Amino acid sequence: MRFVKHILLLLSLVTLSQLNAQIKISGKVVDDDDNPIELATIRIAGTALGVNTDLKGMYSLSIAQKDTVEVVFSCIGYSDVKRRLVEPKGQITLNVRLYRVSKELAELQVTEFKKQTTSMQTIDGKAYKLSPDVSGGSVESLISTMAGVSSKNEMSSQYMVRGGTYDENSVYINGIEVYRPLLVTSGQQEGLSIINPDMVGNIAFSTGGFSAEYGDKMSSVLDITYRDPEKLEGSVALSLMGGSLSFGQSSKKFSQLHGFRYKRNTTLLGSLETKGEYDPQFFDYQTILNYKITDKFKVSFLGNIALNNYRFVPKNRTTSFGTITNAKQFKVYFDGQEKDRFETYFGALSLNYRHSKSTDFTFLASGYLTNELVAYDISGEYWLDEAGTSGDSSGDDVIGGELGVGKYHEHARNRLKASVLSFSLKGNTSINKNNLSYGLLMQRENIYDRSREWELRDSAGYSLPHTGNGVDVIYNMTSRHDISSTRFTFFAQDSYKYLSGAGLFIFNGGIRLSYWDFNKEFLFSPRISVGFVPAANDRFSLRLASGIYYQSPFYKEYLESVTDENGNSHYVANKNIKSQRSIQVIFGGDYTFRALNRPFKLSAELYYKNLSNLIPYEIDNLKVVYSGRNESKGFVAGIDFKFFGQFVPGTDSWISFSLMKTQEDLNGVKVPRPTDQRYSFALYFQDYFPKFPKIKFSLRAIFSDGLPTTSPRSTRDIAYFRTPSYKRVDIGASYQLVGGSADGVRPNNFFRHFKSIWLGVDVFNLFDMANVSNYYWVTDVNNIQYAVPNYLTSRQINVRLSFDF
């Protein structure tokens, strides 16, 4: 009996020791670009044990000790990786790199889609590299083809998102918010986008419902990450509108990437109806330097210098508009010139400290400086006539009746200097299935403004406005300000993944607290989102997001126009201004499937925004003129669709379609907001010759509703009308001179140093559509106003040549 007891005791001890012998396996899963892969699955072969990686690609699981353990790493769109552990013990670190699944057809790639479980979508900018684009393949031009996004000016990098203005979009580069010039009023002046597409590594974009880590804007977030070069690399691009150069290099501890761009789109501006001497010169230099001090410390520097100069000497203009039965012609002869200068300097230093595998901190210090000058003195003599069948038919123009004759003079000396200095500390901590993010920010803003502009008109011998008591200007405005203010911000959020029998749940919740000493305003912004991938059918993914978002005013938004007893207008800073508020609810989903052995994805999002404390504004081309007062409320509601896939094997194409309505209560009258674009359609399509894939074609098409507008110094509650719809098709063809061979062998000559060389031809505005940017208003002595359309660019041909090495 005692023998049996001893045997049972021995068996119990052995069993207990086996139960206590646990192995802990942890590590990180990255892709072939060293980017962390979230939601990758790590499982133990032959068992039901498994976990998913967090937002940083980290994982951890514990298993009972065995002689041999096989760990399987998998993720949709990537090849599985297996690791066999022989007699594992204790804690084991296992870092794995997954490579994308692809079927090569020369250089064409067929890739699965990553599931979107949050409001932030990842965009592949490489698909847009050879696109026919006036801006030269800018990221913003790519963004404007997404669902819910629109752009009304091909010469500008600005875009509108779901009923918001250009000023309601946040743009980040490597975690640092960047800004655009404040005095730009037209696409001709704007120059180069602050984002250099040759340096971009990752693009993340949200049209609403974004998390608490992103700043106080109401509409969208564009988060850009510049890439780290892995070795010596570079590219050169030349076209009729400018050129670019980028090169990078990497060693064990140090990496650098530099980009130069130059733009001179004289031929494009020459297609405008206003003829004259256009002399635009836009230059941009950017650099990012990374140095790994130790395994725990890394320091980075991001720098940018942008010098944009625009000089224009107008000569004449002839514009025909109206209908067949009510045709009109507007003629102007000019004298004078415009000279603008926009200088931007930006620098950011970041220090990253990895405290442990689960915690890291980043300290950021950045400075932004803009020095802007808009100066013009332009006079003109104009004739507005009714085109008809009467008059002297032997002349070039057949004129009916004269509607307006006059002279005008426009003058401006607008100078603005602004600086933004910010310091922030951000951290990330992973605890089990939770990923905590938090941060503090202090931002100091300084504005120096000395602006003066006026306009004088003389119609048929009378100055406008005609009072009979002397000569008055039709418009004048002055602005003199020296303003300094400080903002403080804190955010904290948690991301949590939960795998149940029903499927995978992804939760994100956070708060954002802000204080601005200019108006003594404190803001509390809670935000939450939930993503779900059902286990019954993982081709579906659903997401729901909601939160309170604020548009914290910047300089233009809190300037209020005041007119004195002499009729002179000037801007004053409204210190009682409040942040505009948007309460958002967004519900969306994706469905991925395969057809013709190719991947496709159909996405849809339904959204509603309740708007309050609105600052009414009017849009004139790219100029947004705010009232400077919180005096309106409204809403935005709509639905977005996007069909994405490989309509042609190995190429990404997409179709976007949006329906939207936005309205506000302005002075007791319900009117559409200036961004009320009721419908929008965008297409980006790529193709190639199946037997000769070195020749590629790409097409970009946009068709969108016109926007509400009104006459100068008026408001929509009095009267408004809609501009014509925006219609544009750009097409391009590219031929790969070097690279792309099926066997991957490079030529045995000088061109062996190049990865690829592309020669391309683009046709901008293929169907020569006459799109309207804004209107020039002619007023006769009887105070009758005529809206003369200012048309955008007509059909143009561009030739480009690019080298990658």
Predicted regions and their residues:
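Gram-negative outer-membrane beta-barrel transporters
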Residues: 497-502, 607-610, 627-710, 802
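Membrane-embedded beta-barrel scaffold of Gram-negative outer-membrane proteins
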Residues: 362-366, 576-629, 635, 759-764, ...
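Surface-exposed extracellular loop regions of Gram-negative outer-membrane beta-barrel proteins
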Residues: 535-585, 606-626, 700-714, 770-774
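Short, acidic, small-residue-rich periplasmic hinge/interaction motif at the N-terminus
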Residues: 30-33, 40-45, 70-79, 88-132, ...
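Face-selective signature of the C-terminal outer-membrane beta-barrel domain
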Residues: 292-307, 337-519, 603-606, 654
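Periplasmic N-terminal accessory/gating domains of Gram-negative outer-membrane beta-barrel systems
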Residues: 79, 92, 114-169, 175-210, ...
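Predominantly transmembrane beta-strands of Gram-negative outer membrane beta-barrel pores used
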Residues: 202-213, 219-226, 233-277, 284-292, ...
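C-terminal beta-signal and adjacent terminal beta-strands/loops
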Residues: 702-710, 735-805
